């Protein structure tokens, strides 16, 4: 008497959601139904349907809602579209447009699962990173909070970064390879060992593999422009200093990072040349900016010939 009458079949004979859901779960032998709290009002009806069929009902649990990052209310697709983060696992196309998915954005599945598991739950400690195996053994519905949890897009990215830096350089290099091939059009010329070294230098600064190219394009292509603010460090005496540096580099046979750094710095000390007079123009010549990995690691990877070529171009351009 406390429940209103529910329509179980439409006028065309098709079952409504309530009936179809019960039959589907029973046929699939679902043992636990875990869903959002908005389905709590439907639970008595579903239990009655199970009893009417003479079936054992599964265990029911209702989770608090995932809330908007800003403001009040349930997280929606529009929130993701407006703020630039995915809501769906895969790209979702509608008449209104395309909503990018977690896969297309570059999220690792295990990172997303970890992030979502901690929305309204914890294991009683400060621990945040859980493998799938740990979650399977540790997760307990009794520790799920009753109030909703706000969705934090930046925390979501943080989780992906944590999983990214834990992956081996070799694995990430294989994922990065098709991106480099697409950008350069030279898949045959790409050495996986070189790519692995590059990944080791840049992954700490990335949240996603698809950010690697922006962080490393100078390893594959010479700068086409120079940062205007950084170019102000290019003084009147800089061209001659860079020409002298080329002579020093030309004499180095063991062209490895440590050796190059030692020889260049010894030359600077002997000639009483300040660090800023060489290092900043040197980096600007190779990268086009003053940011990036350790300078001499860059020099080793791009090689002597390319290093000298870029310095010469900067001397004639800046």
Where are the language model's segments positioned?
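A short, ordered amphipathic alpha-helix with a cationic face
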Residues: 36, 145-149, 165-170, 234-236, ...
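Long, amphipathic alpha-helical coiled-coil segments characteristic
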Residues: 229-260, 264
